Amino acid sequence: MNPKTPVIVGVGQVLNRSKDLEEAVEPILMMLDALDQAEKDSGVRLLSDVSSVRVIRGVWDYGDPAGYIAEKIGCDNAETIGTLFGGNQVQAVLNRSCLEILEGKQDLVVLTGAENGSSSARARKQGVQLASTVIEGTSDEIVGSQKPEHHAYEIARGIKQAIQVYPMYENAIRYARGESMDTHLARGSEL
């Protein structure tokens, strides 16, 4: 095996589904917790050896979350990368990370991101401001290209969210296959 073959050595996931806003956890703390879990999952101490910290953009106001994380995990000299918004960013950054490891440009990369959308929505409805760490600065690099998310035709009709678009895709697939609603539902459910 090529010694530069990229390998995922640890994973961590944090879920914060409490309905109590007092128990809401802000995204940067969830990211740090997930990285701690990933390090434990790997079975070795490795976070301080990270060469690049990569954070997927979320709905938060942090300037350089990757830099903040690098400092907290003890790899102050690590490259810091952020992304633009986009559902494809996790896969795009994972792909890039693997290629850079394979090419010898990176040794150990952490990839993280977090949202507290449910807590944020609940807080907005209740007129409550959730605690948020102020993180200034800018990552060494921001990856991704910001293209218009919606066509003018969609915008004119108020179609702005994935939950509004994907049903149209599903109906187009169903129609193209000549399937009834029941047949399409059964086929999709088997996937």
Protein language model annotation of sequence segments:
Residues 1-83, 99-106, 110-191:
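Conserved "HGTGT" condensation-loop signature of ketosynthase/thiolase-family condensing enzymes
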Residues 86:
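Blade-loop segments of beta-propeller domains
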Residues 91-99:
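Conserved phosphate-binding catalytic cores of ATP/NTP-utilizing and phosphoryl-transfer enzymes
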